[in-house]
Amino acid sequence: MNSKWSRRQAMQSVAAAVALASAAEPMLRAQGGAAPHHTTKEDFVRLLTELSNWNRWGKDDQMGAVNLITPAKRKQALALVKEGASYSMARSAELQEAVDNPAPIVRKMTRVGSAAPGTGSGGTGDTFFISYHGYAHTHMDSLCHFLWDGKMYNGYSKEEVTENGAARNAILNFKNGIITRGVLMDMARHKGIDYLEPGTAIYPEDLDAWEKKAKVKVQAGDVMIIRTGRWARRDAKGPWPVAQGLAGLHVSCAKWFHARDIAILGGDGAQDVLPSGVEGVTQPVHLLSLVAMGTPIFDNLDLELIGREADKRKRWEFLVTASTAATPGGTGSVLNPIATF
């Protein structure tokens, strides 16, 4: 009886998986996606060389595309502020374990109010333990976070990252802050829906269509920000295993934003569509951005508020300011980027 029941369950699971796979391509068409761009692992490896910024800013460079945020670029971005209205693009700390958050932020109270005296001076305190890389917490990836064939951006060896942290391409290089123009490419609103379904790929044609509709061009030194509506979907349907399915950029978009000379890539997911569609390479957009181009990444932004505010104003460009933790040797940092209109 148990054996038959197990076989029946297995057959039902297979049938469900086949149905889901069969539905995937029509779903992409319904959401307005472009025709699939087939990319092999060999194509990806060629892109690592074709899109490389190694030595562009010198053999000792560790800033990568952030070099494109010049003093003139900062002044241009500051001039975008007309109202002084500012909005966070960070997800509030996720403290509860979930299928999309296996490493929640742990808060330990070291001093609580009830222990303080009733008169005179008192105080409270806490400690946070944060494993910020992954699919839940808003953070910035430094240029040492990903490697290919034992190398990170600008040819630095994997041996530069030890138990003592990263000696090259660490997050400390960005301690003076990010001040530049941000462009929100709201792909869900562009398609007239609340959110893109998991596994929906965004193609270069989609980026072109968004620019035409929004009448805004992504420029050199910008933070390019992609909203898929990932958190809106979570609010509507609950958490899901995002490593198995997440809307995002197809690897073919890498040429697009390399040509635009963006300084930083950001979005409400992992930037990559998951699955990536490139056999043997889980996150090709991450690899091309961090390793080849030296373009840091803002992962897991919460773009629901800024999406509504930008749509209300029909203004998709704004000042972006962000500051990392000044952590020597860090491979990244928690982050609270601010958009100001």
Model-predicted segments: where are they?
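Hydrophobic h-region of N-terminal signal peptides that target proteins for export
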Residues: 19-24
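Active-/binding-site microenvironments in catalytic and ligand-binding cores
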Residues: 31-341
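Sec/Tat signal peptide C-region and signal peptidase I cleavage site
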Residues: 27-29
